[in-house]
UniProtKB/Swiss-Prot annotation:
Keywords: 4Fe-4S, Cell membrane, Electron transport, Iron, Iron-sulfur, Membrane, Metal-binding, Repeat, Transmembrane, Transmembrane helix, Transport
Primary location class: membrane
Location relative to the cell: Cell membrane
The keyword Membrane belongs to this UniProt entry's keyword annotation: yes
Pfam families named in the record: Fer4_18, Fer4_5, FixG_C
Binding site for [4Fe-4S] cluster 1: 251, 254, 257, 285
Gene behind the chain: rdxA
Membrane-spanning ranges: 24-44, 76-96, 150-170, 184-204, 328-348
Residue intervals of the 4Fe-4S ferredoxin-type domain: 242-270, 266-295
Residues the record lists as binding [4Fe-4S] cluster 2: 261, 275, 278, 281
One GO MF term: metal ion binding
UniProt-recorded name of the protein: Protein RdxA
Record's function text: Predicted to be involved in a redox process.
Length: 469
């Protein structure tokens, strides 16, 4: 019998637990939230006429600033490369340790953990929350819920507010928000992120992971028998029962592993799509084993191949052999390869870029003296920290006369970290070869007119269209 595609949500009230994995999750939460909230306020001196915010996505200026690095619009391949690295990183972690990203560092997990912390501080732990949930709307329930929702809303507002600071100068935007003079886009973005954070982390929680996120389904293609996941050693724990009963396994069916699970699953039923590999059930089970005097590890991180070995009474392989195998090594090599390529491209990129766009409406113009003229839009990017002066030249011109609109010469000054826009005209005399046909081996060259060497710094191929081309 097939299961329904969607099941109505049953509220989950995870019990507070302490242990190594819970501590690791708290540290990751604190560090990741600290980085997210504080990064927009870091300053970085880039000189005059440039923003001093260390990390800034300047949509209006069409540039991305990352400390001492500037990414220009034509360098979007750097962003694509970073996205590829992020994807390969997820493949690597999933192949090695299952959904460890989901359980420890995913924003949905981080904010849900923070909301759960607030919920416990106000309403109490699991049993108190269940009692409050079931009781009628008394004065106690009303004020506790209102207080909890208010704190959630404040966290959500802080989340949305921090995000918009990445897209504008943080102190300036904060002043605009306080004085109610900020751009409407900022207010809309904050509202949307506040609302989604409040709903996703406060009310939907595990449903986002199960129904909205595609990663649980993708991970199936990335995991194999060598992938380390959370597993229940049923050959040791079964049959379940009280410790006073003879012939029973180590599992006393205390339900601690179920009660601490933020996804509400029972790991003893085997690996499930909803499991986010957070390890909280391991902390809960280890605590129970300590109390009843049994060895830890009834629930633990375990590869399927190790499970087969342990069932047979053999010694499992060392963890490093699980992590460093052909699949994970391939992902690691690809990840490192993309990273090295990006670093090399960043270090070797030129300080000047020239982009040429032929004006095609009209394709050419016949002047009063019978000569043919083509027009080109030139975009000169000076990506250095100094003002530069360039001189335009044309190779393979075969008698073409270059000129710049609004200028008597061919020199073009471009300020530091700026883009210069010019219109270049190439004119072919009447009866010349370019005027009567197409000249395709043309090169528009940019020379350094202000430096001591004065050599070419950029060149782009172009075509000249005559009357019969």
């Amino acid at each position: 019998m097939s299961e329904p595609l969607y099941a109505p949500r049953t509220p989950i009230f995870p019990r507070q637990i302490s242990g190594a994995f819970r501590t690791a999750k708290w540290w990751i939460l604190a560090v990741s939230l600290g980085i997210y909230l504080l990064t927009p306020w870091l300053r970085w001196d880039r000189g005059p006429n440039l923003p001093d915010q260390a990390v800034l996505i300047d949509i209006a200026g069409r540039r991305f600033f990352l400390f001492g690095i500037q990414i220009w619009p034509h360098e979007f391949y750097f962003v694509a490369g970073l996205l590829i690295m992020a994807g390969l990183g997820l493949f690597l972690f999933t192949s090695a340790a299952g959904r460890v990203w989901c359980g420890y560092a995913c924003p949905q997990t981080v904010w849900t953990d923070l909301f759960l912390l607030v919920e416990r501080r106000i309403e109490g732990d699991r049993n108190a929350q269940i009692r409050l949930h079931r009781q009628a709307w008394t004065a106690e329930k009303v004020w506790k819920r209102l207080l909890k929702w208010s704190v959630w809303a404040a966290i959500s507002l802080l989340t949305g507010g921090a995000w918009v600071f990445y897209f504008a100068d943080a102190p300036t935007l904060l002043n605009g928000l306080v004085t109610l003079t900020a751009h409407p886009v900022a207010w809309i973005t904050i509202f949307v992120l506040t609302a989604t954070t409040f709903v996703f982390a406060g009310f939907m929680r595990e449903q986002i992971c199960i129904y909205a996120c595609p990663w649980p389904r993708i991970q199936a293609a990335l995991m194999d028998e060598e992938t380390i996941t959370v597993a229940y050693r049923d050959w040791r724990g079964e049959p379940r029962g009280k410790r006073s009963e003879t012939g029973r396994g180590d599992c006393i069916d205390c339900m601690a592993c179920v009660n601490v699970c933020p996804m509400g699953i029972d790991i003893r039923e085997g690996q499930q799509m909803a499991c986010i590999t957070c390890g909280l059930c391991i902390d809960a089970c280890d605590d129970t084993m300590d109390r009843i005097g049994r060895p830890r590890g009834l629930i633990g991180y375990l590869a399927l191949s190790d499970e087969h070995l342990e069932r047979a009474g053999d010694t499992p392989k060392p963890a490093w052999r699980r992590l460093f195998r052909l699949r994970t090594s391939l992902y690691a090599v690809l990840w490192a390869g993309v990273g090295v390529t990006l670093i090399a491209a960043l270090l070797l990129r030129p300080a000047v870029d020239l982009a040429v766009t032929p004006v095609r409406n009209p394709l050419f113009v016949t002047l009063s003296d019978g000569s043919i003229r083509n027009a080109y839009e030139l975009r000169l990017r000076n990506m250095s920290g100094e003002d530069r002066r360039f001189r335009l030249a044309v190779d393979g011109s075969a008698g073409l006369r270059p000129s710049i609109e609004g200028s008597a010469g061919l020199d073009v000054p471009v300020a530091a970290n700026a883009t210069g826009l010019v219109r270049l005209y190439l004119t072919a005399p009447q009866g010349s070869d370019p005027a009567t046909g197409a000249l395709t081996d043309l090169r528009i060259r940019l020379d350094d007119a202000g430096g001591p060497e004065g050599g070419p710094v950029a060149a782009v191929k172009a075509a000249f269209h005559g009357a019969r081309s």
